[in-house]
């Protein structure tokens, strides 16, 4: 069969196959899924009536039997597993954990008035990983979401020398991909130290470095931003993608919104990828047809502001020989960039605890509550990551997921001091917020068995010591460079994790209480349930437009 297909391929076999079986096939169905506002609520009411009717048909003995079954289930949910059963599970011992942090050595080459080069040397099988970090400090607050949209445009539109299809083919032929992104690198929440960056990255076999950088230059310098129809298409696609991401990742949207209540860097990030960015895209879509050129001119002006060699950092993962070649090839790329100084702009969107409820047509909720401990004067300690493990896998798992019926209950605790509870596909709102507050009592009475304590301590290292590729190690090393994180500090953090004791965990309870007492929370979820609890919110709105 394969030989026959090979022979017929040159004679239009696949073209005829597509024409016959797909394009000219009359056996097809078009199915439309149309949302109906209020349908979920009506179904809920119908179910309540059905259950009430069913209950009325039962005898007292049958009702009592159902109550007894429910009580047995609740008891099972709240009863810890037996020690002898847990002991049957295979496990590591704390002695299996490495005490020393493996270094990630970085070569830094900096010269006054020139871009800085960073090199993480590792075996990459002849692949060069490159990334350019452009400083976004010179972008005005109102133009920050324009930067985010530029990352959606560059690489998707045609250029001076290629159509969009030809550009995609050229990139696929010579490289492993070229991408642009905008992000915020955080050093300290308490000190409000963060670094917004626009990045252009790519990877290619080392012999194709010149083609890789030539294509990067083509994308950032020669993209056709005057294609009105393509820009409009991308705007609509971005709006649809954001709405889809909200639908499947509302817990992430809720967490990022919560962080923006107390940290300027997170507020900045809202304009790059969060709800603020979505609102911006909606506004642009609504007014685009009236004056498309005004928005296109704005895209061009912001891109020109970004593309300068001032404060530029070029990173590379690969061999020393390939790094030297990368530096040479980069010089040609730098010649096409501006050399204007980055004039730092003040960020004018103030942080504020808004306690928002975002209404959706979903039947479930995503509930986030928390704050940053460094803003309360409590420095970050390695124990924070242990707390994430024990709170997420023990307390929140049992209370929010098992007892509360949520699909997920998570503890989000970062090395920057963020501490939050987060639920996923949760039938509750107020009950979940109360369970987050219950973390205080859990910590006050923290008393795991020695085996359970050690299991959670070992589990803490599952994220810290996960295997990393050469490119991922390089990314970690580059982030440490930007945030001035030393090897000594990383080692100290690890030592603090290994030094955790139950007494130290219990001593954290007052900090958790102070965090929960800030009463900062976000809910994305069912419109009726949010309205039923409207008194707890400062602001309520529909999530999407």
Where are these predicted regions, by residue range?
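Short amphipathic alpha-helices in soluble, non-transmembrane regions
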Residues: 214-216, 327-333, 435-437, 536-537
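His/Glu-based metal-binding/catalytic segments typifying zinc-dependent metallopeptidases
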Residues: 57-155, 304, 311, 315, ...
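Ordered core of a single globular domain
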Residues: 1-70, 283-338
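M16 family metallopeptidases and their MPP-like homologs
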Residues: 1-6, 26-36, 42, 125-156, ...
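Short acidic, glycine/serine/threonine-rich loops at helix termini
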Residues: 44, 243, 247, 326-328, ...
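In a subset of proteins, long, contiguous C-terminal domains/tails are tracked
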Residues: 166, 499-545
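Generic recognition of flexible, low-complexity loop/linker segments
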Residues: 2-5, 16-21, 105-106, 116-121, ...
């Amino acid at each position: 069969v394969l030989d026959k297909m090979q022979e017929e391929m040159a004679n239009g076999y696949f073209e005829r196959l597509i024409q016959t079986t797909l394009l000219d096939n009359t056996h097809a169905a078009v199915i439309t899924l149309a949302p109906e506002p209020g349908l979920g609520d009506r179904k809920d009411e119908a179910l309540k009536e059905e259950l009430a009717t069913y209950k009325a048909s039962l005898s007292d003995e049958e009702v009592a039997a159902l109550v007894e079954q429910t009580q047995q289930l609740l008891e099972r949910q709240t009863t810890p597993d037996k020690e002898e059963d847990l002991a049957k599970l295979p496990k590591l011992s704390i002695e299996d954990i490495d005490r020393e942090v493996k270094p990630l050595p970085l070569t830094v080459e900096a010269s006054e008035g020139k871009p800085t080069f960073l090199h993480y040397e590792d075996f990459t099988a002849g692949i060069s990983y490159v990334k350019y970090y452009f400083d976004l400090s010179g972008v005005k607050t109102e133009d920050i979401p324009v930067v985010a949209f530029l990352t959606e445009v560059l690489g998707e539109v045609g250029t001076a020398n290629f159509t969009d299809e030809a550009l995609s083919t050229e990139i696929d032929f010579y490289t492993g991909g070229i991408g642009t992104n905008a992000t915020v690198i955080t050093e300290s929440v308490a000190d409000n130290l963060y670094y917004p960056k626009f990045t252009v990255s790519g990877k290619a076999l080392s012999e194709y470095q010149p083609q890789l950088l030539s294509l990067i230059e083509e994308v950032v310098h020669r993209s056709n931003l005057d294609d009105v129809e393509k820009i409009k298409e991308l705007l609509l696609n971005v709006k649809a993608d954001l709405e889809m991401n909200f639908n499947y990742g509302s817990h992430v949207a809720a967490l990022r919104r919560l962080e923006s209540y107390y940290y300027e860097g997170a507020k900045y990030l809202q304009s790059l990828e969060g709800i603020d960015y979505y609102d911006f895209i909606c506004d642009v879509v609504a007014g685009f047809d009236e004056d498309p050129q005004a928005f296109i001119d704005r895209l061009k002006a912001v891109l020109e502001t970004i593309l300068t060699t001032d404060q530029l950092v070029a990173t590379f993962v690969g061999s020393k020989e390939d790094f030297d070649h990368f530096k040479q090839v980069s010089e040609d790329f730098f010649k096409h960039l501006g050399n204007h100084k980055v004039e730092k702009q003040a960020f004018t969107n103030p942080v504020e605890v808004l306690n928002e409820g975002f209404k959706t047509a979903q039947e479930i909720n995503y509930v986030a509550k928390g704050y940053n401990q460094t803003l309360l004067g409590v420095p970050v300690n390695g124990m924070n990551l242990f707390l994430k493990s024990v709170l997420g896998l023990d307390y929140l798992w049992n209370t929010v997921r098992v007892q509360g019926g949520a699909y997920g209950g998570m503890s989000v605790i970062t090395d920057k001091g963020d501490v939050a509870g987060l639920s996923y596909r949760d039938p509750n709102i107020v009950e979940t917020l109360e369970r987050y507050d219950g973390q205080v009592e859990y910590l006050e009475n923290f008393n795991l068995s020695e085996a359970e304590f050690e299991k959670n301590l070992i589990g803490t290292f599952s994220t810290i010591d996960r295997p990393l590729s050469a490119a991922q190690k390089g990314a970690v090393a580059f982030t440490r460079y930007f945030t001035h994180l030393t090897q000594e500090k990383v080692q100290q953090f690890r030592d603090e994790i290994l030094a955790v004791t139950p007494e130290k965990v219990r001593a954290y309870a007052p900090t958790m209480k102070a965090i929960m007492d800030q009463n900062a929370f976000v809910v994305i979820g069912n419109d009726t349930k949010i309205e039923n609890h409207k008194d707890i919110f400062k602001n309520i709105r529909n999530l999407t437009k």
